[in-house]
Amino acid sequence: QGLARRESRRMRGRDVCLLWSDEATAARWAHSVASNPRIKDFSLTEMLASVLPGLAQHRRLVGLDWLGDEVIVELDPMDFAERLRIACLDAFVRSVEKMDAVFTIEGPYGPALLRSQTKPEGLVLPCWANPGEAYSRLEGPWREMLVIKTPLSDFIGERLAWLSRKGHLVGPDYQDGPG
């Protein structure tokens, strides 16, 4: 049970949990590391809030896109988490600069906020660079809310200042469904 893993070839006494970026590749190699494999797709939030911290807690490493021989890349899970955060933030910033706007969801009482999964006492403002992503979240408790387009200069000058005063976080390109 759990994630597929192999013994680390670089760090004695440590296991490497195998993760793939492509479902077809994972399915192709799953039978060589497990007797009854099941492919599980993790969201970015699950990876950052649960999977990678759990691997770190159990002193396991991350092996990326294993193709049957020696695990070429073995990463510390928290280092990998930080790399994921930086890559996602970079992509978000590039998209926002291109659109010159940020999209949020708001109702009659202000912006939609969520509980942070990485900082339990914090609230997060989910926002998107792509309006289609924001509109796709208008279901469940958010179905009566509106997608709001905020010019980038206003988002930086006003919205980020408001979030800072309130002690709230920003959730760029939030991907885990409706509120």
Question: Each predicted region: which residue ranges?
Answer:
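Conserved NAD+-utilizing ADP-ribose enzyme module
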Residues: 1-179
